[in-house]
Amino acid sequence: MIVSRCRDIEEFKKVHAQCENDRIPSAESILALGDYCFCFYSKDTGKLLGCIYLEDDNGRVCLSGFSVRKNYDIVIRAIKLISDIFHEDDLYSLTDKKSAIMVLLRCGFKKIDDETYLRKAF
């Protein structure tokens, strides 16, 4: 897995459009986050597998993202990498998606209410 900035906006928009989650902002809004938008690519093919981004949510650092289907292990590795980079911040994530919840729990996030998960700073 390779993590970097967006390499191809059209590819980014295509993967973003395949996402079935109304909570995800527009592709343009995510790309506008600049240094807080991390794309992850296949080491073998160079294709975009997904994106993790950080936003401010009323003073909380909120981690969100999207990916192509059936790449749980890669998504977990990507989230752990980004979480380690921002280890001095409490990271929150808001979701009701079972697949996202499974990934967050495997990355050390804890459920703190119905749809909110937290990974404490370390």
Descriptions of predicted regions:
Residues 28-48:
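A short helix-loop-beta-strand connector motif used in the catalytic cores of GNAT acetyltransferases and
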Residues 39, 46-55, 60-64:
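Conserved beta-strand in the GNAT
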Residues 68-85:
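Conserved acetyl-CoA-binding loop-helix of GNAT-fold acetyltransferases
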Residues 85-96:
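Conserved GNAT acetyl-CoA-binding A-motif
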Residues 114-122:
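STAS-like cytosolic regulatory interaction modules
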